[in-house]
Amino acid sequence: VHVVAGDITKIGCDAWLLPTDGAFTISGAFAEEIGLESGQRLANQVWDGSRVIRLEQSLAGRPQVWLANVGRNPGDPRNEGSWYADVIEPFARSAKEGLEPTGVPPLLAIPVLGTGDGGMAADKGTIYRELLPEMLCVAESQEVDLVLVCWGRRSLSAAQRVRRDLVAGRSLKELWDMGPKAEVLVTEAQRLGELARDRQMVLFLGAGASAGAGLPTWQRLLDDIADEAKLSQDNLEALRRLDMRDQAAILEQRLTGSTLHEVLRDRLKATEYGLTQGLLASLPSREAITTNYDTLFESAC
């Protein structure tokens, strides 16, 4: 279970949960994301007995969108935080069933339910205390990765406090499978955490940070450009033995400027940032350095 600050409609996940009510009213930025005006109702959707159903108009190549009926009336006894947490398990189960298996757990994103127009804005602590324990249980039982996407730093800090309380007394090695180097990794993680809290850490992002969002690593990008330049297999293997900067210089000579720019524009195009960018952008770091041409980290910030 991960916790980040950001925009759930922009995070690169397999599916995300969109809160609505029994009449399919969509509000705020959620409405804009699916082409509606805030407060407008979705047409051609019917609840099938479940509080979670897939949005029929999900776009190809984009994360699936699942609707959650979290609507309630004033004075409704269901206003308790558990009313909102109860949609997490059916969302995770249904979304996983609707995705093609890839060999790795799917990443499913959940907003802080009930704190916008849901009526729990004045009691967000209750929501965090209900959502996070349920997410921990569901992540394990359904074998999925879940990310709670908070809107803003204050929301993130509140969620992190609740998560710290949940895991108090448990070691990092117990919570995370770090393999045989767990001792070294835990020590280093604690050191970096202290630096981040003191705002003494500068982030350095390489191409691997963007790979999770579907962008190529530098070598894969160079291989794609070499393919566009129609290099033979022998020449490609010889090229790969060179420093990547030398590879780029040679490929630039093989392709005309416009063709090279078209290839780069096509290969470096991404609409959603990955979990890595979301986690890094959520750290209290004042500065960041990157060798990347994409703007995914900026989007996550």
Where do the model's predicted regions map?
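Solvent-exposed alpha-helices and their adjacent loops that cap or buttress functional pockets
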Residues: D7-I11, S58-A60, T102, V138-S141, ...
